[in-house]
Amino acid sequence: MRVLVIGSGAREHALLLALGKDPQVSGLIVAPGNAGTARIAEQHDVDITSAEAVVALAREVGADMVVIGPEVPLVLGVADAVRAAGIVCFGPGKDAARIEGSKAFAKDVMAAAGVRTANSEIVDSPAHLDAALDRFGPPAGDPAWVVKDDRLAAGKGVVVTADRDVARAHGAALLEAGHPVLLESYLDGPEVSLFCVVDRTVVVPLLPAQDFKRVGEDDTGLNTGGMGAYAPLPWLPDNIYREVVSRIVEPVAAELVRRGSSFCGLLYVGLAITARGPAVVEFNCRFGDPETQAVLALLESPLGQLLHAAATGKLADFGELRWRDGVAVTVVLAAENYPGRPRVGDVVVGSEAEGVLHAGTTRRDDGAIVSSGGRVLSVVGTGADLSAARAHAYEILSSIRLPGGHFRSDIGLRAAEGKISV
């Protein structure tokens, strides 16, 4: 089976590495890829938001299956075009991908499915913003306002703040750009990311993970696409894990089928484990980055066969997933000034070591690997427990040099110290 992976991040590097371990995968192709994926897959530079370009490439390389990594091609309907061309595709169609592409749509689906989430309100006019802010945040008894871009924002469209001026400025900027604003009540409790492979109403959960969205230590600073993650979660009871699948993911999958928007792909639910139980923070329509890097490091089942089963309506027959013992930790190395406009073009030293997954990298004509994006690399450490996996990840990271690069030193630290409980 020849597999074409769409995307250019560390998530796609992790997918390619896992697919390469599947004995039924005979060839790997990636578009557009990066300096790291070029070492393990045939690489093509195409516009991945163009359905025509992706279909043409899949035909050209003789792909038996296409796996779409990022959310933008999915929301634009690229998976629909691939399937219409008669090629197996892992990734939801445009209608189902609205679960991530529109937070208002996701809220409507959750309400119909009886799934607990934050109270919310859509604001589509600057004239209504101030009155809406009065109904949320501290005026409503919450510790902070939660102000979100209703559309895709690469993980950086959310502001959580106790400062009304900051909340208002973010909402006003979104509205000025023509984006509706979603105001939400504050959900308190540790967060969980759970990936589920979904084939209409069949749901196969992967290991739960936790990611770190803020750029700074102790969850300070601006939101990012993610600065690190670990899996599994030693503090998450099995009964809560099962409850998330049976009372959240399965009802949402069934509701999408009922609406004629059946989901086939990776459904990612972001949760807060509150005092009243799990509540949904967000749904995404694809593998998350950086959680994927940690979760797939522990997968023993053949990934290509798993994704192909889901994409061809045979997921119910796949069987129970197998996992390695232990824990995996991902730490992201970011470029100077990320999540603002990142500095690029710096030489990265030590990036070809085992456990290093590339994201914002390119290879110059002289062979040097240079930074080309905000999140430059992910390093993945594994170990018998969280402390050992953390030590392994930071040991790998210590041998990498990137001028101006920065990372968080506290990925998984509170959990390793036993400071998270539910």
Curated annotation (Swiss-Prot):
Needed co-factor(s): Mg(2+); Mn(2+)
Protein's organism: Mycobacterium bovis (strain ATCC BAA-935 / AF2122/97)
Matching InterPro entries: ATP-grasp, ATP_grasp_subdomain_1, PreATP-grasp_dom_sf, PRibGlycinamid_synth_ATP-grasp, PRibGlycinamide_synth, PRibGlycinamide_synth_C-dom, PRibGlycinamide_synth_C_sf, PRibGlycinamide_synth_CS
GO function terms (MF aspect): ATP binding; metal ion binding; phosphoribosylamine-glycine ligase activity
Gene3D superfamilies cross-referenced by the UniProt entry: 3.40.50.20, ATP-grasp fold, A domain, ATP-grasp fold, B domain, Phosphoribosylglycinamide synthetase, C-terminal domain
Name by which UniProt lists this protein: Phosphoribosylamine--glycine ligase
Keyword entries, A-Z: ATP-binding, Ligase, Magnesium, Manganese, Metal-binding, Nucleotide-binding, Purine biosynthesis
Pathway(s) served: Purine metabolism; IMP biosynthesis via de novo pathway; N(1)-(5-phospho-D-ribosyl)glycinamide from 5-phospho-alpha-D-ribose 1-diphosphate: step 2/2
Positions with a binding annotation for Mg(2+): 282, 284
Residues in coiled coil: none
Residue intervals of the ATP-grasp domain: 107-312
HAMAP family for this protein: GARS
Catalytic activity as recorded in UniProt: 5-phospho-beta-D-ribosylamine + glycine + ATP = N(1)-(5-phospho-beta-D-ribosyl)glycinamide + ADP + phosphate + H(+)
EC class (word): ligase
EC number: 6.3.4.13
Residues the entry annotates as binding ATP: 137-193
Cofactor binding note from Swiss-Prot or TrEMBL: Binds 1 Mg(2+) or Mn(2+) ion per subunit.
Listed GO biological process terms: 'de novo' IMP biosynthetic process; purine nucleobase biosynthetic process
Family: Belongs to the GARS family.
